[in-house]
Amino acid sequence: MTEFKRIPPEQAQALREQGAVLVDVRDAQTFQSNHIPDSVHLDNHSIADFIAKADLDKPLVVVCYHGNSSQSAAAYLVGQGFSDVYSVDGGFELWRATYPDETVQG
């Protein structure tokens, strides 16, 4: 894959169940207050370390607030060598509306 794909929350959940890595690019405080279980918070401070330790061929699902910022982040991650990248349309807000029991705090 040379470009990322935009996917709905249902497809993101299916990928998550198959072992995909979920990264959340919202701000740290918002991430702490509510996020998808087992997702990784990714920001300018953590991205280099994340990339260095990541399996570039493992599916990577990017989520933000509403599905806009995640597209830029997904494109960047493709440029860094990730081969299977997805951006969640509707972001965390649509995820939370679709899967209200699939969020955690802290």
UniProtKB/Swiss-Prot annotation:
Gene Ontology cellular component list: cytoplasm
Active-site residues, Swiss-Prot/TrEMBL: C64 (cysteine persulfide intermediate)
EC number(s) stated in the UniProt entry for this protein: 2.8.1.1
Catalysed reactions listed for this entry: thiosulfate + hydrogen cyanide = thiocyanate + sulfite + 2 H(+); thiosulfate + [thioredoxin]-dithiol = [thioredoxin]-disulfide + hydrogen sulfide + sulfite + 2 H(+)
Main location: cytoplasm
Keywords, comma-separated and alphabetical: Cytoplasm, Transferase
GO-annotated molecular function: thiosulfate-cyanide sulfurtransferase activity
SMART domains given in the database record: RHOD (SM00450)
InterPro entries: GlpE_sulfurtransferase, Rhodanese-like_dom, Rhodanese-like_dom_sf, Thiosulf_sulfurTrfase
Record-level GO BP terms: glycerol metabolic process
UniProt keyword Cytoplasm, yes or no: yes
Keyword Cytoplasm in record: yes
PROSITE patterns registered for this protein in UniProt: RHODANESE_3 (PS50206)
Domain of life: Bacteria
Compartments, as annotated in UniProt: Cytoplasm
First-tier enzyme category under EC: transferase
Domain named Rhodanese: residues: 16-104
Pfam families: Rhodanese
Family: Belongs to the GlpE family.
PANTHER family according to UniProt: FAD-DEPENDENT OXIDOREDUCTASE, THIOSULFATE SULFURTRANSFERASE GLPE
Function according to Swiss-Prot or TrEMBL: Transferase that catalyzes the transfer of sulfur from thiosulfate to thiophilic acceptors such as cyanide or dithiols. May function in a CysM-independent thiosulfate assimilation pathway by catalyzing the conversion of thiosulfate to sulfite, which can then be used for L-cysteine biosynthesis.
Name of the protein: Thiosulfate sulfurtransferase GlpE
Species name: Pseudomonas savastanoi pv. phaseolicola (strain 1448A / Race 6) (Pseudomonas syringae pv. phaseolicola (strain 1448A / Race 6))
Organismal lineage: Bacteria, Pseudomonadati, Pseudomonadota, Gammaproteobacteria, Pseudomonadales
Gene that specifies this protein: glpE
